[in-house]
Amino acid sequence: MSFADMVAKLRVSLALQPLITALFANSPFTEDRPNGFRSMRSNIWLHTDPDRTGMLPFAFEDGMGFERYVDYALDVPMYFVKRGDTYHDVAGADFKALLRGELPQMPGERATLSDWANHLSTIFPEVRLKRFLEMRGADMGPGAHVTALPALCAGLFYDPQALDQAAQLVRPWTADERQALRRAVPAQALDATIGGRDLRSVARDVLTIARGGLTSRGRR
């Protein structure tokens, strides 16, 4: 896959992650009582360390690429450095200082590739860029949902025409609209709105696109 393919898929997957949360919302109870949310799990992530979570608005800006994601990751505060079997608490430290050997908690210690891999594992945006795209929006559900989610993603992202249609659908949404949808979905799910449309209507369009993508790949 190409560089442009990564950017296109990252943008579409980020924009649609709240919709996926709404479709697969499945955590309305806490300790056997209604908690006021369709997806409590999604609400919890809304209130988790903003330095390492969220909708990555920079991904929609001109110049987005692997380097920009690396810059973002470098700016995320560290949790730990592992040496042997020991985890050294360096919470809040700057990874760039570790690259320079100037980490106050471990002076002279320099970053390794393992340190970088460990650091990347502590970043939890709605979609995490790895050697693949890790989409984090859906709650766990029954078996039918477990198989429906990869079918939806395959239909959207593995067929070029479907991906282009999905990109056209989400392109008019602004960063503020995407963020407002992300905030609304945990409680409202498909009753939320974006771009003057209710999310349920948008979901129908997305499912139609995904079905077309699956059909073109010989899947039904």
Task: Annotate each PLM feature.
Residues F3-R220:
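C-terminal accessory/tail domains of diverse enzymes
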